Amino acid sequence: MSEVIGENEAKALYEELYKQLPRKKNLSMLVKNICKSSDTEKYVYELKDNKYIETVFIKRRDGGTVCVSTQVGCPVGCIFCESGRNGFVRNLTSSEIVQQIILLRRKVNRIVFMGMGEPLFNYDNLIKAIHILRDRYGLNFPTDGITISTVGPVDQLKKLREEHLKIQLTISLHAATQSARNRIIPHMRIYAIEDVVKQALSYSERHNRKIVFAYLLLPGINDRPSDVR
């Protein structure tokens, strides 16, 4: 049976761990490259197994938004996205997810899981990372500042509905018809649009959160007047 420690001991343990985080021996990844523009910074991280992921920091006047990766590669295969061109390699650990934010050394006021990979296909590590980010002795990040952007795998949306997280949710829909969505996100054809929307609205009702439905206009595919209607 493991020993249960008190609040003061737990706080001291967290403080010691976070003091050590910047030291290389405690990190499983390193910054390989940084590409900067006037309002964005793209970080390329090299992982211990020599794989690479990207994290994007978008500057704001009072801090910034960080777009975090959850997988190496992506199994979804959206036709407009480069992340899945070489297929899916592996899930990131919860530590690798959190380290992307720590290594930025920037003031972050919004975290969006919309980098490389489909967040809900790395469900367990994603949820563990969110708990670490929200922990008052961890990064103590506010729930309202965390968003999952997902193509909406229905089974995982059902699980997310039962979590006591109340985080923000964006559904990458990108189509009004099943045929158009199958063309845009071919590996999600097993999920009907109606079921994705239904589960998203169920999450909204349970957690009192507005759902954002993302729709990228693609000429000749989903930009017809009938799609708008």
Where are these regions (language model features)?
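Flexible, acidic/Gly-rich N-terminal and inter-domain linker regions that tether
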Residues: 1-64
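Short linear Ser/Thr-Pro motifs
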Residues: 28, 34-38, 69-70, 83, ...
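Short aromatic/hydrophobic contact patches that present stacked aromatics
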Residues: 42, 65-69, 147, 214
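Short, small-residue-rich loop/turn micro-motifs
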Residues: 47, 72-74, 173-175
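Canonical Radical SAM [4Fe-4S] cluster-binding loop centered on the CxxxCxxC motif
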Residues: 59-95, 103
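Cys/His-clustered metal-coordination modules, chiefly Zn-binding fingers
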Residues: 99
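Conserved AdoMet/S-adenosylmethionine-binding subsite of the radical SAM
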Residues: 106-110, 115-229
